[in-house]
Amino acid sequence: MVKVAILGASGGVGQPLSLLLKLSPYVSELALYDIRAAEGIGKDLSHINTNSSCVGYDKDSIENTLSNAQVVLIPAGVPRKPGLTRDDLFKMNAGIVKSLVTAVGKFAPNARILVISNPVNSLVPIAVETLKKMGKFKPGNVMGVTNLDLVRAETFLVDYLMLKNPKIGQEQDKTTMHRKVTVIGGHSGETIIPIITDKSLVFQLDKQYEHFIHRVQFGGDEIVKAKQGAGSATLSMAFAGAKFAEEVLRSFHNEKPETESLSAFVYLPGLKNGKKAQQLVGDNSIEYFSLPIVLRNGSVVSIDTSVLEKLSPREEQLVNTAVKELRKNIEKGKSFILDSSKL
């Protein structure tokens, strides 16, 4: 069985994520960490009658949290709020993630690190560069969790099909739409690229197709607006993060993944088919991209590039737009580590 640590367990994503992973049959020990309230949350969850143990640790006990952890999820950070610029958000969360990943490199160097904190496009490069400097980086062990984009794509695709053609819409099952749609690229705005793999559904959507793309890309804004500035996606993010973590955990047992085309934002140069992926997106120097992954024993062993080999002209446009924006996001993360090392 597997010890899982959640860093940032008291937050809006961290609490429901902790609950969902306490329910997982693949977890034997759940360790919760935050700067406040994690001990109480751990005690609360420990009363649930599943077979995993659960302990919450205070801000001075990160070594105990991480000791022997095989999977570490990082939802820690400041959420999107009105009046907070993206740059403000980045600076705060960049420092938090750098500090936590440094601790993982020190106390759990072989752990698989799942980055949930935003902005994923910049924070995953920070995690990678931090581990590189420590001499602890393993390319298959760092994954940016972009699964919420797929969860939204599955939901919204059925919603739009119901609007356009109720008969076809009623035939669909939102829980298995990952067989007909995947999402690649990055994890913000126009870097998010929904790919409908069942092209007959593109035809069915007709003019709703562009609305579908936009809604998947900017679905998070709906939640910020609906919560009237009091928060962003937390429950749906926790669900998507738990689903992704469960696939990583299943791979420790050599079980077949439940989600077809499960994507993650990964470091391409260190992975099998990474170079091929760079060529197919038209940029041999792009270091990170979210693509379907192949997991073994909790780590990414290769990338599935097949989705890139049969793109429509419109999808190629989406990839080109995403790559331009991703380059800036990635550079921002790398520069943060470079600049902080000069201080």
From Swiss-Prot:
Keyword NAD in the entry? The reply is: yes
Query: Catalytic activity, per the record?
Result: (S)-malate + NAD(+) = oxaloacetate + NADH + H(+)
The UniProt record lists the EC number as 1.1.1.37
The active site lies at H187 (proton acceptor)
* Record: residues binding substrate: R80, R86, N118, R152
Q: Which GO terms describe its biological process?
A: fatty acid beta-oxidation; glyoxylate cycle; malate metabolic process; NADH regeneration; tricarboxylic acid cycle
- Entry's Gene Ontology molecular function annotations: L-malate dehydrogenase (NAD+) activity; mRNA binding
Instruction: Give me the residues that bind NAD(+), please.
Output: G8, A9, S10, G11, G12, V13, G14, D34, N93, I116, S117, N118, M237
InterPro entries the UniProt entry points to? L-lactate/malate_DH, Lactate/malate_DH_C, Lactate/malate_DH_N, Lactate_DH/Glyco_Ohase_4_C, Malate_DH_AS, Malate_DH_type1, NAD(P)-bd_dom_sf
Among the entry's GO cellular component annotations, what is one? cytoplasm
Top EC group: oxidoreductase
- The yes or no answer to whether the keyword RNA-binding is present is no
* Places the protein is found: Peroxisome
Q: Which domain of life is it from?
A: Eukaryota
* Keyword annotations of the record: Glyoxylate bypass, NAD, Oxidoreductase, Peroxisome, Tricarboxylic acid cycle
- Give the family from UniProt: Belongs to the LDH/MDH superfamily. MDH type 1 family.
Miscellaneous comment as given in the Swiss-Prot or TrEMBL entry: Yeast contains at least 3 malate dehydrogenase isoenzymes: a mitochondrial (MDH1), a cytoplasmic (MDH2) and a peroxisomal (MDH3). Present with 3300 molecules/cell in log phase SD medium.
Q: Which NCBIfam families match?
A: MDH_euk_gproteo (TIGR01772)
Oligomeric state and partners? Homodimer.
Protein name (database record): Malate dehydrogenase, peroxisomal
Origin organism lineage: Eukaryota, Fungi, Dikarya, Ascomycota, Saccharomycotina
| Encoding gene per record | MDH3
